């Protein structure tokens, strides 16, 4: 809107192809430092004529897919190491001898695009071929699985901190002000289940993960955890310093930014040695063999052991962070926006890896993401949070179809698809709130389905649909279906 109103030009750099589809008139696709495709947004995103652009689009999870997308094989060449031929040749299904010996020039097509490819005319067939999809790890036995984690009335608050607050507390002994961020979370998670937490920024998703990891202490409620598959859950200490080795091993957190968990001064060998030595007492040859085995599981070779984090790409760092977490052989892995900083091809590879490890180890995941398509593809159940309160819980397929909570409807309507012809369904004059109302429904002020004073005065009841689908709303499920 600003560009249209002011007439200014804009260069927009992003991994988010959905945002590109909404903002840009033209798109340039770059690979190994070169422009490989340039055209109108519609041309590039709907009928890409370069194999790399085609692979990028095929790597994006979509709300319409029930499975994970296939990741691009291989990795980009190191800077200055592209060779004499096409930089993408080693990863390209169309590559021929000429691709490996002769670098393609950027040429103009009859439709006005510019493309760097010897075989761009053959990509029409690739565009008409359905994308390869990966089956998500089967969880047919979840109905019989025992709970591994139970949250009972979990509430978390942050202390309000500011200059006036500190002065008041010191001079007058006034009470500290706490702002509630997570309120009365009741949730049972089964062993081997993947539960996705979704909601806008400030909804409490990451706060819940930090509390489960022992980095934030709740102000109310309890967390029960089963470490030995016995079905006998015990109280989980609220702070990490109070937890024993078994709890520390069993619960691992993968951060959004892998640099938060990788010591820049340590080699990958030293990073992996920490959990392997601490929890299993491995040394010497046994330590080396286990480290190599773990790296191979995340599709990195033994030669990575001598490298520092600064010598890795973003995707490789995240794979090492995942390897470090799984080195402890955890029962529960907390994934906090683990793919948000990655390009779509690396994201697809990381999601496939998490799915593969879940299938191999029966690991339980709590997966936090803003990307609703990623959550749908990877999760067995989804929890929708608004201002720290649960408003919908249910099987992934059920939450993404009707009936749904009005807030879930707003979230799904705002999804940006990588299609310039697909416009998001935004609520008119919608303004994100900084805090929930004092009483009534947390979503009352923004709700496009608000029905009156009852929304302002009374906390909505939980309504139960099929297969354990729960919606917290004053509107009946039958009416939500009609809406």
Task: Name each model feature, range by range.
Residues 57, 286-303, 412:
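Conserved ABC ATPase "signature" region
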Residues 329:
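Conserved catalytic motifs of ABC-family nucleotide-binding domains
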Residues 1-67, 338, 342-421:
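P-loop NTP-binding/switch modules centered on Walker-like glycine-rich loops
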Residues 41-148, 161, 165, 395-483:
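Charged, flexible cofactor/metal-binding loops and thiol motifs
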Residues 213:
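Helix-to-loop junction immediately C-terminal to a conserved catalytic motif
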Residues 308-312, 316:
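Conserved ABC ATPase signature
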Residues 43-48, 77-83, 230-252, 266, ...:
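ABC ATPase NBD coupling module
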């Amino acid at each position: 809107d600003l560009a249209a109103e002011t007439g200014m030009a804009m260069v927009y750099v992003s991994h988010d192809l959905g945002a590109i589809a909404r903002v840009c008139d033209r798109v340039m696709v770059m690979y190994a430092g070169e422009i490989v495709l340039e055209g109108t947004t519609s041309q590039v995103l709907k009928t890409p004529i370069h194999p790399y652009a085609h692979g990028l689009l095929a790597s994006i999870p979509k709300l319409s897919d029930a499975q994970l997308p296939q990741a691009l094989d291989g990795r980009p060449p190191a800077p200055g190491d592209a060779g004499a031929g096409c930089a993408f040749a080693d990863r390209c299904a169309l590559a021929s001898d000429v691709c490996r010996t002769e670098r393609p020039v950027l040429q103009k097509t009859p439709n006005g695009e510019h493309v760097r490819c010897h075989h761009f005319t053959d990509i029409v067939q690739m565009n008409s071929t359905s994308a390869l999809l990966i089956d998500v790890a089967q969880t047919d036995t979840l109905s019989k699985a025992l709970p591994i984690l139970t949250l009972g009335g979990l509430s978390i608050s942050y202390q309000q901190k500011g200059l006036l607050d500190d002065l008041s507390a010191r001079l007058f002994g006034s009470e500290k002000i706490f702002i509630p961020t997570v309120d009365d979370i009741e949730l049972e998670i089964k062993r081997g289940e993947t539960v996705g937490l979704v909601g806008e920024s400030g909804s409490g998703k990451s706060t819940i993960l930090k509390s489960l990891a022992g980095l934030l202490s709740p102000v109310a409620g309890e967390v029960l955890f089963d470490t030995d598959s016995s079905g006998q859950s015990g109280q989980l200490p609220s702070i990490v310093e109070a937890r024993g080795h078994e709890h520390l091993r069993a619960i691992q957190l993968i951060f959004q930014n892998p640099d938060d968990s990788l010591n820049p001064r340590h080699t990958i060998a030293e990073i992996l040695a920490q959990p392997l030595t601490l929890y299993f007492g491995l040394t010497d040859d046994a330590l080396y063999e286990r480290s190599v085995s773990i790296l191979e599981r995340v599709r990195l070779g033994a030669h990575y052991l001598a490298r520092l984090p600064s010598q890795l790409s973003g995707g490789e760092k995240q794979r090492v962070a995942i390897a470090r977490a799984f080195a402890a052989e955890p029962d529960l892995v907390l994934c906090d926006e683990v793919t948000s900083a990655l390009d779509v091809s690396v994201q697809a590879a990381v999601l496939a890896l998490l799915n593969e490890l879940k299938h191999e180890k029966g690991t339980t995941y709590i997966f936090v993401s803003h990307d609703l398509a990623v959550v749908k593809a990877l999760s067995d159940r989804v929890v929708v949070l608004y201002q720290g309160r649960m408003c919908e819980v249910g099987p992934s397929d059920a939450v993404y179809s009707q009936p749904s909570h009005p807030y879930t409807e707003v979230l799904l309507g705002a999804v940006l698809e990588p299609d310039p012809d697909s416009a998001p369904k935004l609520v008119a004059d919608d303004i994100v709130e900084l805090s929930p109302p004092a009483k009534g429904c947390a979503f009352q002020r923004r709700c496009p389905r608000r029905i009156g004073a009852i929304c302002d005065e009374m906390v909505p009841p939980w309504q139960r649909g099929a297969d354990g689908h729960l919606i917290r709303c004053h509107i009946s499920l039958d009416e939500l279906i009609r809406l």
